[in-house]
Swiss-Prot record:
Pfam families named among the record's database cross-references: TPMT
Residues involved in S-adenosyl-L-methionine binding: W12, L47, E68, R125
One function term, GO molecular function aspect: thiopurine S-methyltransferase activity
Compartments, as annotated in UniProt: Cytoplasm
InterPro entries per UniProt: SAM-dependent_MTases_sf, Thiopur_S-MeTfrase_Se/Te_detox, Thiopurine_S-MeTrfase, TPMT
Coiled-coil segments on the chain, per record: none
Protein name: Thiopurine S-methyltransferase
One Gene Ontology cellular component: cytoplasm
Protein family according to the UniProt entry: Belongs to the class I-like SAM-binding methyltransferase superfamily. TPMT family.
Classification of source organism: Bacteria, Pseudomonadati, Pseudomonadota, Gammaproteobacteria, Legionellales
Gene from which the chain derives: tpm
Amino acid sequence: MNKGQYFWNELWCEGRISFHKKEVNPDLIAYVSSLNIPAKGRVLVPLCGKSVDMLWLVRQGYHVVGIELVEKAILQFVQEHQITVRENTIGQAKQYFTDNLNLWVTDIFALNSALIEPVDAIYDRAALVALPKKLRPAYVDICLKWLKPGGSILLKTLQYNQEKVQGPPYSVSPEEIALSYQQCAKIKLLKSQKRIQEPNDHLFNFGISEVNDSVWCIRKG
């Protein structure tokens, strides 16, 4: 287990998961239509944790594919929502699945890419920003390989002064987004606004005075 894997396993084991939200992300509800997902389309949720957003997507009629490093997160998701799953193990990857939900427990960088069938859309609420800068280019490449031509990504990022705190979540600039997805046909900024300070937001607790949240729609050519 490398340093990054140990870090995320420790967070879940100790219950330090303030990044997990109990409500469906309002930006997903507001902007999912911009993805133009076909009926019964496949949606990838990378680094999914136990996000309730996955359940919301399933209820919209989509087939959801989640990839998560920490098995505890997936087990909690299944138990908390009383989902009856089948199990499978392929190599180092463990699979929990139903007819419209397919959850993989593995390091996304080590997953055999052939195990993921092409998807119509990707929903990235907190995956890109969870990765240090040196890993982000490889992550983008992996996800784009799984995305069908013409498919879209709903991506959430944030910006803040990283001199005070290094993350995660990491600050990702619009310039990095433009560079990372330059091979795509369209990069559209759907929303950009200053975050309202909340007591449980650890960025503010570390002395960050300003955080800017952005929502992007990126279409693959």
